[in-house]
């Protein structure tokens, strides 16, 4: 595996490749990330991964400086997955001058849910993903359903900007107790780690109630928030939305069996966890 930081060297290395499969990450890799590499290999060759902690998607009170950087360990994991190139640019490589041009998603998708609680987050995501796509020029790129809203925004961005890349969605990888794998799980204390799977269990109960025919989605969402708050969580949102566009469904859509997803974000202690479950 070649480890490359220069954009020009990356382009030289990939010249002539027309089936490249790309997996962008911020590093601190876990089994969830590695499953993306394996899925990428099913859709293209060679597989290219990137590791870049993108300052643009961190808010002023978020953990950019504390975000775990484990490059050597990540390199060893990617080598075992037969990744062809790891693109690991420095901030100077990616942003040699101030990044004045940004890619901003529409408010109806980028300003809700995560976008409401993390203003500017998806602008940072779209800007760096578009730039990485321009550098790697993949045929396919793999994103996890764990970040459901991000997946949808990136897919729509590629469609609307006519980027010649297919976005492949990867299922969420969970620990044996149901907790979705995340780099932020390492911040949990032992007691918090024992409690953390309750987020997934809460979403499962919401899913079951919707499938059983409950139609008062507002009450379902409020019950779930109240349940978590009673266990010491601080929920930002628990929301049932249409899978197609993350708009709240109306009664007719519910009766017609519109595919739905329930999404959640909540703090447990100092750690903010997100999860979702398709209905």
UniProtKB/Swiss-Prot annotation:
Domain of life: Bacteria
Disulfide bridges in this chain: none
TM spans (from-to): none
CDD domains reported for this sequence: PanC
NCBIfam families to which the protein is assigned, alphabetical: cyt_tran_rel, panC
Sites where the protein binds ATP: 26-33, 144-147, 173, 181-184
Keywords: ATP-binding, Cytoplasm, Ligase, Nucleotide-binding, Pantothenate biosynthesis
Protein name: Pantothenate synthetase
Subunit architecture: Homodimer.
Family: Belongs to the pantothenate synthetase family.
Subcellular location: Cytoplasm
Single GO term (MF): pantoate-beta-alanine ligase activity
SUPFAM superfamilies, sorted: Nucleotidylyl transferase (SSF52374)
Record-listed (R)-pantoate binding positions: 57, 150
A Gene Ontology cellular-component term: cytosol
Pfam name, any one: Pantoate_ligase
Enzyme class: ligase
Catalytic activity: (R)-pantoate + beta-alanine + ATP = (R)-pantothenate + AMP + diphosphate + H(+)
Function recorded in the entry: Catalyzes the condensation of pantoate with beta-alanine in an ATP-dependent reaction via a pantoyl-adenylate intermediate.
Lineage of origin: Bacteria, Pseudomonadati, Pseudomonadota, Betaproteobacteria, Burkholderiales
Entry binding sites for beta-alanine: 57
Pathway(s) the chain acts in: Cofactor biosynthesis; (R)-pantothenate biosynthesis; (R)-pantothenate from (R)-pantoate and beta-alanine: step 1/1
EC number: 6.3.2.1
Entry annotation: catalytic residues: 33
InterPro entries from the UniProt entry: Cyt_trans-like, Pantoate_ligase, Pantoate_ligase_C, Rossmann-like_a/b/a_fold
Gene Ontology BP annotations: pantothenate biosynthetic process
């Amino acid at each position: 595996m070649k480890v490359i930081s220069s954009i020009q060297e990356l382009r030289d290395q990939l010249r002539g490749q027309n089936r490249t499969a790309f997996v962008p990450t911020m590093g601190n890799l876990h089994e969830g990330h590695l499953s993306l590499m394996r899925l990428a290999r099913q859709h293209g060759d060679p597989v290219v991964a990137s590791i870049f902690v993108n300052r643009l998607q961190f808010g002023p009170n978020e953990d950019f400086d504390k975000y775990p950087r484990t490059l050597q360990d990540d390199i060893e994991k990617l080598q075992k997955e037969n990744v062809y190139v790891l693109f690991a640019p420095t901030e100077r490589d990616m942003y040699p001058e101030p990044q004045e041009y940004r890619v901003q998603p529409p408010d109806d998708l980028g300003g809700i849910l995560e976008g409401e609680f993390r203003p500017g987050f998806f602008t940072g995501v779209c800007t760096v993903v578009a730039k990485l796509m321009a550098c790697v020029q993949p045929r396919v790129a793999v994103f996890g359903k764990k970040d459901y809203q991000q997946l949808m925004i990136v897919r729509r961005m590629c469609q609307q900007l006519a980027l010649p890349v297919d976005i492949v969605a990867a299922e969420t990888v969970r620990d044996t107790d149901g907790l979705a794998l995340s780099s932020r799980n390492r911040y949990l204390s032992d007691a918090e780690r024992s409690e953390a799977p309750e987020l997934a269990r809460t979403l499962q109960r919401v899913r079951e109630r919707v499938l059983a025919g409950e139609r008062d989605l507002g009450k379902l969402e409020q019950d779930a928030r109240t349940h978590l708050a009673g266990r010491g969580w601080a929920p930002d949102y628990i929301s049932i939305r249409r899978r197609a566009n993350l708009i709240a469904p109306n009664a007719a859509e519910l009766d017609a069996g519109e595919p739905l997803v329930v999404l959640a974000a909540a703090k447990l202690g100092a750690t903010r966890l997100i999860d979702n479950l398709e209905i």
